[in-house]
Regions:
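Charged, low-complexity intrinsically disordered terminal segments
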Residues: 1-187
């Protein structure tokens, strides 16, 4: 996870790693990524995810109240934030289940962006089902990956998606490391 929480009030999350190549790219290709700034109650959820990971690694429980300032409960710009996390050791695959639900409940469109298209069977099934039902399903992925084996593996899933009506777009401006999903103007 790439999480940064500052004074319990501002959080950043996304795909950005900390190294020069993620800012300037490599000699071979530019690097594109997406990172979000979050304020308000959503920051607590980011901090919680970070502290759970911290405890898992260090066995240190960070509970001092100074790390948890009062939350500004105002909803700005009519925007709500929900942070969903998953891990290989979690009892439920929350992110995967969220993707499946979003895909199967979409009425108009779902636009997805991923650097590595390695869908689980339920996600691929939901993408195909939604596309066959007339939902505009679009997938943006990099034309070339930063890992050749992953690129080949990703390509192996594309025909099945395309045959169901998923529109696949290849990003050619370098390596796109973003992981995004938007659906029906409300998610």
């Amino acid at each position: 996870r790439k999480i940064c929480v500052i004074d319990g009030r501002v959080g950043f999350i996304g795909g950005m790693n900390i190294a020069k190549r993620y800012v300037k790219g490599t000699g071979k290709q530019k690097w594109r990524d997406t990172h979000l700034r979050i304020e308000g109650g959503g920051v607590y959820a980011l901090q919680r995810a970070f502290l759970i990971d911290w405890y898992f690694v260090d066995r240190t429980l960070v509970s001092n109240r100074k790390y948890y300032p009062p939350v500004d409960s105002k909803i700005r710009n009519n925007c709500l934030v929900q942070v969903v996390t998953s891990s290989p050791i979690a009892p439920w695959p929350d992110i995967m289940q969220g993707y499946v639900r979003i895909l199967l409940q979409a009425q108009k469109y779902v636009y997805m962006e991923t650097p590595y298209f390695l869908p689980t069977e339920p996600v691929l099934f939901a993408m195909r089902t939604a596309a066959l039902a007339g939902v505009d399903i679009r997938l943006l992925m990099p034309r070339h990956s930063d890992a050749r084996m992953v690129e080949w593996a990703s390509r192996s899933y594309l025909m099945e998606a395309i045959e169901a009506g998923v529109k696949v777009y290849l990003y050619t401006g370098g390596f796109n490391h973003s992981k995004l999903l938007v659906s029906d103007d409300n998610l």
